[in-house]
From Swiss-Prot:
Species in which this protein is naturally found: Cuphea lanceolata
Keyword Lipid biosynthesis found: yes
Gene name of the record: ACL1.2
Sequence similarity: Belongs to the acyl carrier protein (ACP) family.
HAMAP family the UniProt entry points to: Acyl_carrier
Molecular function via GO: acyl carrier activity
Organelle targeting peptide span: 1-53
Keywords assigned: Chloroplast, Fatty acid biosynthesis, Fatty acid metabolism, Lipid biosynthesis, Lipid metabolism, Phosphopantetheine, Phosphoprotein, Plastid, Transit peptide
Name used for this protein in its record: Acyl carrier protein 2, chloroplastic
Lineage: Eukaryota, Viridiplantae, Streptophyta, Embryophyta, Tracheophyta
Amino acid sequence: MASAAPASSICIKSASCSALAPGRISSLRSVSLPVSRKSFFSRRGSFSLRVNCQAKPETVTKVCNIVKKQLALPDDSDVSGVSKFSALGADSLDTVEIVMGLEEEFGISVEEESAQSIQTVQDAADLIEKLMEKKGH
């Protein structure tokens, strides 16, 4: 019978979060936490937890709206950062059209290689933030 790993938790606090956007505790964009201990099924193992929060909520909202428009979804459709394009009914052509809409809206150019890695709304929003940062916006 397999035994589960003991639970552990991590708490991150910021003393100066009043000037930051709601929901953000610092200006950090990512945190990596290496963990090494017994894992599930009583096997020794190590893994790394990476929390990546690049895109601003406003960017995610804009991407959600563009996705709804490109896929002709009703305004009350449940589209969020975790929404997969394929689960929303998008095929490869729809995804290309979504990327073109994002390029137009945000004034960016997405390389084909990067466009192929976009699976979710959050992926798209993170890529947009990264490209806009490179562009100097």
